[in-house]
Structures are given as C-alpha cells and as structure tokens.
C-alpha cells in the first residue's frame, strides 16, 4: 500500500483500491485524486471538504451518510465499533473525542459523533485517528486491530498536541506513525521534529514526517 499525505488530515491510500480520507486541503483541490472510496471522519468543513464534489462512494457515521444522500452521494452509513467491507477494503469505525457539527450555509446540522477509522487493504491496516483528544481506549485500537500505521493529529488547540500524541502512539503501538493535522494554519503550527525524535529515541516505532504530496510505501506484516 502507498500512503500519500496531501496535507492537513487528508490522506490517500493506494493499493487494490484508492481510498481518500477527509478530502480537504487548504487552498487546493483533491478532485484529481479520483478515489474509488471516500472516508469522512466527521462533519467539520476541513474534513468533509470536497466530499460532495467528488461524488464517490463514501463511508461515514450514519448521520453524515444520511446528509450526504440528500446531496446525491452514494454514502455507506455505519457507527462506532462497526466494520464494513467495500470492494475488498475494510473500514472499522473507532471513537474520537471531538465535536462533529456539519457546517453548511452558516447554519449547520447534526453530524453525529466524531470518529476515526482502521482501514484494511492489501494486508495492511492503517489507523486514521481523525480529530481527537487523547483517550485511554486508544489502547484497544492497538489490542483489537493491530494497525501497521497510525495517523495521529499533533497540532494542538483543536486536537491533541505533541505530548499527548506521543502517548497515543504508545497506546496504539503501530510500527510507523505519521503526524497529521498540523501546520495548516498558524493556530496549529508545530514543529514535528521533536515528536519524531522522542518516539524513535524511546520506542521501536518509526515516525515518518511527510511533506504535502509525499508518499511512503507500506508492506504487509509478515
């Protein structure tokens, strides 16, 4: 599997299928990624992004799925703790501690709960934590699903920051950690280097700091 960080929380997983998570990038477009499946962690506009414009099969919590269906999107609703298989790709929805309002025309509507995903494809499991605070049940993500890669927000203010993300990485126990949701705007500007240094100095985990548009190849676990 190839993992491409497009910026903010937007990640493209490429293998047998192309899965685009949280299709938003600041000042740009993700339309040309042409994914097979879109996954949305919660209703905020910096995560819903171009979901409607893409018009693809979309996985989201039930409330968002119902909203997307009113826009003509072939959405697959699910809920936290559930797993679905779409075209050979598995999506397990995990908890996240965050708000989840769907922002539309300055009014908005109920977006259910914020969530994360463990996505399985081609023998690789990727945990996208979504926007979240640190919580102890992240340990269960590691114990139940054994992800190979953890995508963790580190920007602070609206999510956990570096120190909490370090603890989250230890809870999840993935072999590789990729920081997300940082440096998009000044309010979430952080240097990811100390995060990488501390984790690699104290654990066997590797931290891959990607630039927007940069990719990393992940091989299936033996």
Where on the chain are the PLM-derived regions?
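Core dinuclear metal-dependent hydrolase active-site scaffold
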Residues: 1-33, 77-143, 212-222
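Binuclear metal-ion centers of metallo-dependent hydrolases, dominated by the metallo-beta-lactamase
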Residues: 4, 69-83, 166, 170-222
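Alpha-helical scaffold elements within enzyme catalytic domains, especially in hydrolases
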Residues: 12, 53, 67, 198-201
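Active-site neighborhood of phospho(di)ester-bond hydrolases with catalytic His/Asp-centered motifs
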Residues: 20-22, 35-44, 58-61, 127-132, ...
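Active-site metal-binding motif and surrounding structural segment of the metallo-beta-lactamase
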Residues: 25-76, 144-151
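Active-site environment of divalent metal-dependent phosphoester hydrolases
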Residues: 27-28, 44-49, 65-68, 82-85, ...
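Short, glycine/charged-enriched secondary-structure capping and boundary segments
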Residues: 34-35, 52-55, 73-74, 106-107, ...
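Metallo-beta-lactamase
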Residues: 115-175, 180-189
């Amino acid at each position: 599997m190839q993992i491409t960080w497009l910026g903010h929380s937007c990640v493209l997983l490429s293998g047998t299928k192309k899965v685009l998570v949280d299709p938003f990038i600041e000042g740009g477009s993700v339309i040309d990624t042409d994914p097979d499946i879109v996954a949305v962690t919660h209703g905020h506009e910096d995560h819903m992004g171009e979901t409607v414009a893409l018009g693809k099969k979309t996985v989201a919590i039930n409330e968002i799925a119902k909203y997307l269906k009113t826009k003509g999107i072939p959405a697959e609703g699910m809920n936290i703790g559930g797993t679905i298989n779409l075209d050979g790709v598995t999506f397990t929805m995990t908890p996240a501690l965050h708000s989840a309002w769907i922002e539309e025309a300055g009014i908005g509507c109920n977006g259910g709960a914020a969530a994360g995903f463990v996505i399985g494809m081609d023998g690789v499991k990727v945990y996208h934590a979504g926007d979240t605070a640190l919580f102890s049940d992240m340990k269960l993500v590691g114990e139940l699903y054994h992800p190979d890669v953890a995508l963790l927000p580190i920007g602070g203010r609206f999510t956990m920051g570096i120190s909490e993300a370090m603890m989250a990485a230890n809870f999840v126990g993935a072999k590789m950690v990729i920081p997300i949701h940082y440096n998009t705007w000044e309010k979430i500007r952080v240097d990811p280097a100390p995060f990488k240094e501390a984790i690699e100095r104290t654990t066997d985990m590797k931290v891959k700091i990607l630039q927007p548009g940069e990719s990393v190849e992940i091989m299936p676990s033996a």
